[in-house]
Amino acid sequence: MVSIINYKSDNGMTAVIKSSHYSVMLYVKDKDGNIIIDNKPYSGVISAKNALRKLGGNWETIEE
């Protein structure tokens, strides 16, 4: 089973964290649609969320 969490920051960036039993991947776009992080693997969801914090801005989950 894959869990998908969508995020948006106050500076216009969007992100998706996809997690399964085997991996956690992070995908981030800036406000212009340019890819910043393209499916980079992380050891866990917390590590991926920490990577979002390092990009700056206030991140919140969004419903899709």
Predicted regions mapped to residue ranges:
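Short N-terminal "domain-start" leader segments
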Residues: M1-K29
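Mixed-charge, Lys/Arg-enriched low-complexity segments
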Residues: S3, D32-E64
